[in-house]
UniProtKB/Swiss-Prot annotation:
Its main location: cytoplasm. It comes from the Eukaryota. It is found in: Cytoplasm. Pfam families: Cpn60_TCP1. This is T-complex protein 1 subunit delta. The gene is CCT4.
């Protein structure tokens, strides 16, 4: 009898463990979602993060906050990955996707407590998500890239929740112009790497400007009296050093008398002069030199020779900038002086050093060439590095919104209107279903209301009253009825110009449901040796 009892006990324990693991996973993931819930919407709060290196970051961008948080639980890290996926797919809605995932996990937890199998929940959630995406595409308004006003409104909605919201009327057109200037008419893709964001401390955010072409923060080298402006520029981008070669660290050169020393100096002069002559022979008159950590990228004697030959020199080009510069200027990086030929050079009408709000920058105007791609530089201004970083992130989000509209040319009303409409339609469709699936769809529909509820709470409104009012308006056919923080209540958000790309919402719902499916299918966590 005793043996039989212990067997049944063991079986009971085994059944209990997966439920405990699942519950612990859901609690961990929801804790992450709750941590950033207050940062959603125009009245959302910012988070101050102190990194391990002592840097201070102030942001309300969901992906930035989660990326910097010290998260230990492996399932909680999945929410960070979901936020990163939303950032790369849509660029905006990184907070919404995490909050939505947390709400769906809460719904799943309630369903698990009712004894419904996790696989059935996960699959029904996926079906409901697919139906939600179909609904979003039905209610979205088509948009043309020629309709500049609609694009600006969509960018303004994205910027309204950021620190830079007061400058949204200025930054939104800038973001639209930047994306459209690098996008072909019928293209469905935009490479945001073709837009270079350059940060400069000084001035205010209102001094931010867009430059059609290339801007470098490095200044022209003037120590040897070289030129600071070149018309009809032929631009060379080199990755080798114009300085005497050094021996290896293990080797030494011993000089016993002054004649040998004189010979070494003569050799150095001849070596450097030979390199400079080869550069001049290829008709290059503007030289960009990559930063080197092994030895001087260019020494004073070489600068003297280059100045005498009338070549403008800009040194300390970062390795990360090489690809952008070669693409923008149409020049190929040159790793050896023997490969320095005219066909590898880029060309521009004018290269000059200009004074921009008290700081010097190098501007390339009228870039032309077979290999040159259209690129844009945006010079971001701000009082300190924290404001600059947050402005860069905000502007990146606005650029991503316009990129979304190039990919999927549809706009939907913001302010929680689409979520309420999907919720209403799913609930209506669930009534015609049979069995457990109807119950799961109802929970999914209720979970979607977390977005308008959070927007209302963060704006200091009575969320229950607002959601009830929205539901009744949507029942009467007002599909664009959402929350307006400006009006402190409900309004037709489409007419109020609170707009967002349909891709942001479709991507958020799809990613959230996939993440929930992954979490629900985990029934144990083991640690490898």
């Amino acid at each position: 009898m005793v043996a039989q009892k212990s067997v049944s006990n063991a079986t009971f324990k085994n059944k209990e463990k997966p439920q405990e693991v699942r519950r612990a996973n859901i609690v961990a993931a929801r804790a992450v979602a709750d941590a950033i819930r207050t940062s959603l919407g125009p009245k959302g709060m910012d988070k101050m993060i102190k990194t391990s290196r002592g840097e201070i970051i102030i942001s309300n961008d969901g992906h930035t906050i989660l990326k910097q948080m010290a998260i230990l639980h492996p399932v909680a890290k999945m929410l960070v990955d979901v936020s990163a996926a939303q950032d790369s797919e849509a660029g905006d809605g990184t907070t919404s996707v995490v909050i939505l995932t947390g709400a769906l996990l809460g719904a799943a937890d309630r369903l698990l407590n009712k004894g419904i199998h996790p696989t059935i929940i996960a699959e029904s959630f996926q079906k409901a998500a697919r139906r939600s995406v179909e609904t979003l595409l039905e209610i979205c308004h088509p948009v043309s890239l020629d309709d500049r006003e609609d694009l600006i409104r969509a960018a303004s909605t994205s910027l309204s929740s950021k620190i830079v919201s007061q400058y949204s009327s200025f930054l939104s057109p800038l973001a639209v112009d930047a994306v459209l200037s690098i996008t072909e008419k019928d293209s469905k893709t935009v490479d945001l790497n073709d837009i270079r964001l350059v940060k400069k401390v000084g001035g205010t955010i209102g001094d931010t400007e867009m430059v059609d072409g290339v801007v470098l923060t490095q200044t022209v080298v003037k120590t040897a009296g070289g030129p600071t402006m070149k018309e009809k520029a032929k631009i060379g981008l080199i990755q080798f050093q114009i300085s005497p070669p050094k021996p290896d660290t293990e080797n030494n050169i011993v000089v016993s008398d002054y004649r040998q020393m004189d010979k070494i100096l003569k050799e150095e002069r001849a070596y450097l002069l030979n390199i400079c002559k080869k550069i001049k022979k290829a008709k290059c008159n503007v030289l960009l030199i990559q930063k080197s950590i092994l030895r001087d990228a260019v020494n004073d004697l070489a600068l003297h020779f280059l100045a005498k030959l009338g070549i403008m020199v800009i040194k300390d080009i970062e390795r990360e900038e090489i690809e952008f510069l070669s693409k923008s200027l149409g020049c190929k990086p040159i790793s050896d002086v023997e490969l320095f030929t005219e066909d590898r050079l880029g060309s521009a009408d004018l290269v000059e050093e200009i004074d921009s709000d008290g700081t010097k920058i190098v501007k390339f105007s009228g870039v032309k060439g077979v290999n040159a791609k259209p690129t844009v530089s945006v010079i971001i201004r701000g009082a300190n590095s924290m404001i600059l970083d947050e402005t860069e992130r905000s502007l990146h989000d606005a650029l991503c919104v316009i990129r979304c509209l190039v990919k999927e040319r549809g706009l939907i009303a913001g302010g929680g209107a689409p979520e309420i409409e999907i919720s209403r339609r799913l609930e209506r469709e669930s009534r015609s279903m049979e069995g457990v699936e109807a119950y799961i769809w109802q929970e999914f529909a209720q979970a979607l209301e977390v977005i308008p509820t959070t927007l209302a709470e963060n704006a200091g409104l009575n969320s229950i009253k607002v959601i009830t009012e929205l539901r009744s308006r949507h029942e009467n056919g007002d599909v664009n009825e959402g929350i307006s923080v400006r009006r402190s209540g409900t309004t037709n958000t489409y007419e109020e110009h609170i707009l967002q790309p349909v891709l942001v919402s479709t991507s958020a719902i799809t990613l959230a449901s996939e993440c929930v499916k992954s979490i629900l299918r985990i029934d144990d966590i083991t640690f490898s040796r």
